[in-house]
Amino acid sequence: MAMTVSSGDTTAHLDVDRILSLFQLSKEQLHMVMCRLREEMERGLSRDTYQEAPVRMLPTFICSLPAGRVNGSFLALDLGGTNFQVLRVRFGSPCEGVKHVVSETYRISHELMQASGQQLFDYIVDCIARFLSNQNIKEPLSLGFTFSFPYKQIGLDQGILLNWTKGFNIPHCVGKDVVQLLREAIQRWQVPMGSHNS
């Protein structure tokens, strides 16, 4: 069975090809992009230029990766915008890797995004306490805290908030160690926790 192609289909196909061709880069153009990206990363690494560099290259203080030696259960916290997520991640043997993940997501209201730092971090710890209760977790677990805002990490478990994004506006937190703010809220709520890492 033969298919017929209308002139309208051919014209549309040519239009798509023409538009796609605008996004195809030559080897020379790709090399220019690579060089420019490298320049910007080097500016971000330099003590003299990192402050104004578009690609900030701040140290993470992570000196090595676990290499399969991690086992047991851990809490993972993720504050990334209008949602806050609490996860329990269970690692098995090196061969098994991640065995099980359970998570709950909590909404961050617009009002809370404009509230005080204490209110925000108290809410975060309230969510952690609810998660622990919902999952019937009684033992203290070590936790990792993903804080998806610009911050300067000054140690493995220390991070100074540079500025808020994503609609948050809590000036009191800017310039403060967000891990310490979390620790203080955990102490206020008396939630049993293991060690904390940002």
Segments (PLM) and residue ranges:
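Short glycine-rich anion-binding loops that position phosphate/pyrophosphate groups of nucleotides
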Residues: 82, 148-152
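Glycine-rich phosphate-binding loop and adjoining helix at the ATP-binding site
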Residues: 103-125, 151-198
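Short helix-terminating capping/connector loops at secondary-structure junctions
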Residues: 69-70, 97-99, 134-141, 191-197
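Gly/Thr-rich phosphate-binding beta-strand-loop-beta motif of the actin/hexokinase/Hsp70
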Residues: 2-4, 60-99, 142
